[in-house]
C-alpha cells in the first residue's frame, strides 16, 4: 500500500499558463508560494499541474496573488537535457482538488472592484 497525498495553501506566483489540446483536454500550470511558519523564511515554491474542468476554472478565475488550497499528488517530470544528454527531473504537484480561498483583490484595499466603470 502506498500513500502520495499533498495538501498546500498558498498564493499563486503568476497568471496560469494554459494549453488547450485538439482532444478537448485542458492543462494548466502555475506556481504556488507557501509561507513557512517564521516570517524571516522565504516561501517554498511548488509547480502545479491541473487538468480538465479544474484547469478551466483556474484559467478563468485564478490570477497572480490568488490564495489557493489544493489537494494532489507528487509526480516527477523527467527528460534528457538536449545539450548535455544528462537525465533531468522536476517535482510537480498533480492537482486533484482546488479551492479558491480568496483573490488578491479581496486583500488589497486599493484594488478596483470587479465591474467598476469610472464616471466621466
UniProtKB/Swiss-Prot annotation:
Coiled coil: none annotated. It comes from the Bacteria. GO terms for biological process: DNA replication. GO terms for molecular function: single-stranded DNA binding. Keywords: DNA-binding. Residues 3-102 form the SSB domain. The keyword DNA-binding applies. Homotetramer. This is Single-stranded DNA-binding protein.
Amino acid at each position: 500500500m502506498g500513500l502520495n497525498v499533498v495538501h498546500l495553501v498558498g498564493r499563486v506566483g503568476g497568471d496560469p499558463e494554459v494549453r488547450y489540446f485538439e482532444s478537448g483536454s485542458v492543462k494548466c500550470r502555475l506556481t504556488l508560494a507557501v509561507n513557512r511558519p517564521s516570517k524571516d523564511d522565504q516561501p517554498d515554491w511548488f509547480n502545479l499541474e491541473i487538468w480538465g474542468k479544474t484547469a478551466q476554472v483556474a484559467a478563468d478565475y485564478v490570477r497572480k496573488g490568488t490564495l489557493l488550497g489544493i489537494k494532489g499528488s507528487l509526480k516527477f517530470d523527467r527528460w534528457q537535457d538536449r545539450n548535455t544528454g544528462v537525465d533531468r527531473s522536476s517535482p510537480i504537484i498533480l492537482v486533484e482538488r482546488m479551492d479558491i480561498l480568496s483573490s488578491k483583490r479581496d486583500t488589497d484595499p486599493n484594488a478596483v472592484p470587479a465591474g467598476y466603470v469610472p464616471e466621466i
